[in-house]
């Protein structure tokens, strides 16, 4: 972590702005890495391909969703205004005190010989306060450092908006997948009813099987309706990221199926210090170091110099008056503010350490979710789903031959449906965890290898 001496020797003003540039570079890099990771994961398609393989004019990509959210978020607009306000404070900090004009009339409107204005002495004086101890430079440094913190905070807001939008986007992709699964189940169950009626009419099955099949078909329709309602909610949630109601898009375009094994946790933790939330503390440290120098400079007394003509009414003569004034720092040498500034600086490292610990906790939790979802995906994709599909195919074939009943068919359909739903939920959890980890570390996870893509 770069540090600046607390003493009088200090870096030039240009060096103070490097912290903001460093933080901005980290934030831009984090945003780029997030996009790269999502491209590798299939969430940022180059064309509007729906999750179910079709296309639609109303499809929305993640990139477009993030652009909308960034352009419409009120907190970002307020942050931009705050950056402008900080620029005004920096400008004000570099302004010198204005000169003062004063007029002084003596020996007038008195008694005796001083009655009226016959013996009046009139002095017109211009005085200027000269700030000593490098106050102006220290003040400008502090204002620039404070502006860097404001910029860093605004960039963090950008990352938060991107993270929220990505999370809503992934959830909407999952909702689209859930609806597709529910509609497929409803279609499979509905096609079973005519076959059941024919078997009952032929005397091959009891009448109760038609009732059971109809109940299953109705339940599948209800589930499809629930999935459709959940999809509408997820769509509105995404549109709410840029304040749009109702949504003006039909679907979001992305591919949840492109996944791969996560790297080791130690590899991920190695990038934790690149997180912009930690980089912000470099700007905070610089701002507090600058405040220490400001408070030290305020201990130096300022000098006020005045000069001006004096007119003597009695003799009609004129003279010049010079004045010098300076406070004597006997008791107040700004000791309290200097101590406060030093203590504020001293706690910066601990605050950064606490922030890093919080990030580590978040990263560990996100990695746990990633590892858990990957394990579930691997098992579902490798054994459970193929077995469930084979079982359904075998039961359906056996049902046509009279070897299985309708309950067997419905059970096999339900098992496959449950496995497909669990698989979709695991994919959503996987991509949500990836997005969170990439936001925390400001770097992409290793993209899935060829074996992962081909599974």
Residue ranges and their predicted role:
Residues 3-5, 154-274, 366-369, 373, ...:
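Periplasmic alpha-helical coiled-coil/stalk elements that build and connect Gram-negative outer-membrane
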Residues 78-90, 157, 161-182, 191-194, ...:
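Amphipathic alpha-helical coiled-coil segments
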Residues 31-42:
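Bacterial N-terminal signal peptides
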Residues 2-4, 10, 15, 21-23, ...:
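Acidic, low-complexity, intrinsically disordered peripheral segments
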Residues 52-58, 102-135, 139, 249-263, ...:
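Small/polar, glycine/serine/threonine/aspartate-rich low-complexity segments that form flexible
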Residues 64-70, 205, 209-210, 214, ...:
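Amphipathic alpha-helical coiled-coil scaffold segments and their short linker/junction regions
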Residues 67-77, 84-98, 113-116, 124-141, ...:
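A glycine-/polar-enriched beta->alpha junction
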């Amino acid at each position: 972590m770069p540090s600046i001496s607390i003493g009088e020797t200090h870096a030039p003003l240009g060096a103070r702005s490097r912290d903001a540039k460093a933080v901005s570079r980290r934030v831009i890099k984090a945003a780029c890495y997030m996009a790269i990771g999502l491209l590798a994961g299939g969430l940022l398609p180059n064309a509007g391909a729906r999750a179910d393989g079709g296309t639609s004019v109303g499809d929305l990509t993640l990139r477009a969703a993030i652009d909308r959210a960034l352009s419409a978020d009120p907190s970002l607009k307020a942050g931009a205004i705050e950056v402008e306000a900080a620029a005004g404070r920096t400008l004000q900090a570099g302004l010198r005190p204005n000169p003062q004009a004063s007029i002084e009339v003596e020996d007038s409107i008195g008694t005796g010989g001083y009655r009226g204005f016959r013996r009046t002495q009139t002095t017109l004086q211009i005085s200027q306060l000269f700030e000593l101890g490098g106050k102006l430079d220290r003040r400008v440094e502090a204002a620039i450092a404070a502006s860097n913190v404001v910029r860093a905070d605004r960039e963090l807001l950008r990352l938060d908006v991107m993270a929220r939008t990505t999370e809503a986007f992934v959830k909407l992709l999952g909702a689209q997948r859930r609806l597709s699964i529910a509609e497929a189940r409803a279609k499979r169950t509905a096609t079973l009813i005519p076959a059941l009626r024919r078997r009952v009419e032929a005397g091959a099955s009891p009448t109760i099987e038609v009732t059971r099949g109809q109940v299953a078909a109705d339940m599948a329709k209800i589930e499809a309706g629930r999935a459709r309602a959940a999809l509408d909610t997820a769509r509105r949630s995404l549109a709410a990221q840029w304040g749009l109601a109702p949504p003006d898009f039909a679907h979001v375009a992305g591919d949840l199926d492109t996944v791969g094994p996560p790297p080791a946790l130690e590899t991920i933790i190695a990038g934790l210090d690149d997180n912009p939330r930690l980089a912000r503390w470099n700007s905070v440290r610089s701002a507090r170091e600058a405040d220490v120098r400001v408070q030290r400079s305020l201990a130096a007394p300022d000098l006020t110099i005045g000069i001006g003509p004096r007119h003597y009414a009695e003799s009609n003569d004129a003279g010049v008056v010079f004045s010098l004034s300076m406070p004597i720092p006997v008791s107040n040498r700004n000791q309290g503010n200097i101590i406060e500034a030093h203590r504020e600086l001293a706690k910066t490292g601990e605050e950064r350490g606490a922030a890093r610990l919080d990030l580590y906790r978040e990263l560990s939790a996100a990695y746990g979710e990633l590892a858990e979802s990957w394990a579930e995906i691997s098992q579902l994709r490798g054994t459970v789903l193929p077995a469930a599909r084979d079982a359904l195919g075998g039961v359906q074939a056996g049902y046509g031959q009279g070897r299985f009943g309708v309950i067997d068919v419905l059970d096999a359909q339900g098992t496959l449906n449950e496995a497909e739903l669990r698989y979709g939920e695991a994919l959503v959890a996987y991509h949500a965890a990836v997005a969170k980890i990439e936001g925390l570390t400001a770097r992409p996870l290793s993209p899935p290898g060829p074996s992962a893509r081909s599974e």
